[in-house]
């Protein structure tokens, strides 16, 4: 079973994080071990918009998964071939557990990235992390990134 924590980075900090994703990962992996979100996480991340995520799940994933259930505040999506996704909400993150094919992860990431471009995921305990929707670099963004390093 694969486990992810997914955060929505505040738009005002996105430009400062680009190129420093390793530092963000180091912070977020520490947050996973705390029952309450760290102060730094509350500062850098938006509160998860549950309606936005619910819409992404129902509108986009409801078409390809056999069952989409909501019980005890947790989404459970089941596909007969790919497997099962469990999604739990906390104020600043989503906790996702995928049991089955890696296609489950891809389906969820595509749905969330279509809903908003600022989602950043870490794979708990595996050292994998990244933007769900890759950031497009313009020349101006690259020049600013060099200045802020």
Show where each model-derived region lies.
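Acidic (Asp/Glu-rich) sequence patches and key acidic residues
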Residues: 1-91, 103-110, 122-149
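Short cationic amphipathic helices and targeting signals
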Residues: 92-99
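A common structural junction motif
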Residues: 112-119
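Short hydrophobic/aromatic-rich beta-strand segments that constitute the beta-sheet cores
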Residues: 96, 121-122
